[in-house]
Amino acid sequence: MNMFLLLMSLYLLGSARGTSGQSDESSGSIDHQTSVQQLSGEFFSLENPSDAEALYETASGLNTLSEHGSSEHGSREHTVAEHTPGEHAESEHASGEPAATGHAEGEHTVGEQPSGEQPSGEHLSGEQSLGEHASGEQPSDEQLSGEHASGEQPSGEHASGEQPSGEQPSGEHASGEQSLGEHALSEKPSGEQPSGAPISSISTGTILNCYTCAYMNDQGRCLRGEGTCITQNSQQCMLKKIFEGGKLQFMVQGCENMCPSMNLFSHGTRMQIICCRNQSFCNKI
């Protein structure tokens, strides 16, 4: 009878532990084996009926405590299902510790755990709020940096706007140089004009009436185009003699600019140029 009660109590304890999961079953089976060995050792060590009655009372007390523990464990499965130290305290309570102490320890452990977890949760929430505050400050810094960049952009545009204004004086400077160049060009002919004036004044002092003839024979007689010309500026009276085959063919006389004295040869024809300075007739036969 006593063995039947022990087996029933162990069965009830095993069924109460079976609902807590596989990890609880392994720890509960170890605790059950320990309690079975302890109770069997106590049973075999007893010899008198008074000890059997005490064992019966102990087994019935354990049954009551196990039922009480299983009911409390079922009511607190959702709260303490994942808390291993609390279940360990309850397993120690099932292995033979006093129910009030184990229950008080279980409640103390369970009670302390939420209170301990609550500051940790608040700490996490505080860290989360600090993280959110940091994350909130980060966009503000980025916003300030963005505003700073956007503030710098108008300054860049202002600099780019100032660049054409800086180019405009350079253009005015170039146009000013161009106008100065035009002024220098306009002054240059005026400078050349006085240089030409002395030549004209010099040449005007030696104005001559040059005898002209389009065709003159070798004897100095004008056959065609007889007349006179007035030397102006640097003009001089010039005589051209054309020879063919070594014989004088005809002569031409007139007013020419910058008269050089030279002999020209071309295909058996020779042309002799004679400049008559300050003379009206150069033909001297």
From Swiss-Prot:
Signal peptide residues on this chain, from the entry's feature table: 1-21
Tissues expressed in: Testis.
Chain spans, region 9 X 5 AA repeats of [SV]-G-E-Q-[PSA]: 110-194
Region (7 X 5 AA repeats of S-G-E-H-[AL]): 85-184
Aminoacyl-tRNA synthetase as UniProt keyword: no
Glycosylation positions in this chain: N278
Compositionally biased spans, kind Basic and acidic residues: 69-95
Keywords of the record: Cytoplasmic vesicle, Glycoprotein, Repeat, Signal
GO CC, alphabetical: acrosomal vesicle
CDD domains: TFP_LU_ECD_SP10_like
Top-level lineage group: Eukaryota
Sequence repeats: 66-70, 71-75, 85-89, 91-95, 110-114, 115-119, 120-124, 125-129, 130-134, 135-139, 145-149, 150-154, 155-159, 160-164, 165-169, 170-174, 175-179, 180-184, 190-194
Residue segments, region Disordered: 64-200
Pfam families: UPAR_LY6
Chain positions covered by the region annotation 3 X 5 AA repeats of S-E-H-[GA]-A: 66-95
Subcellular location: Cytoplasmic vesicle, Secretory vesicle, Acrosome
Protein name listed in UniProt: Acrosomal protein SP-10
Source organism per UniProt: Papio hamadryas (Hamadryas baboon)
Taxonomic path: Eukaryota, Metazoa, Chordata, Craniata, Vertebrata
Gene: ACRV1
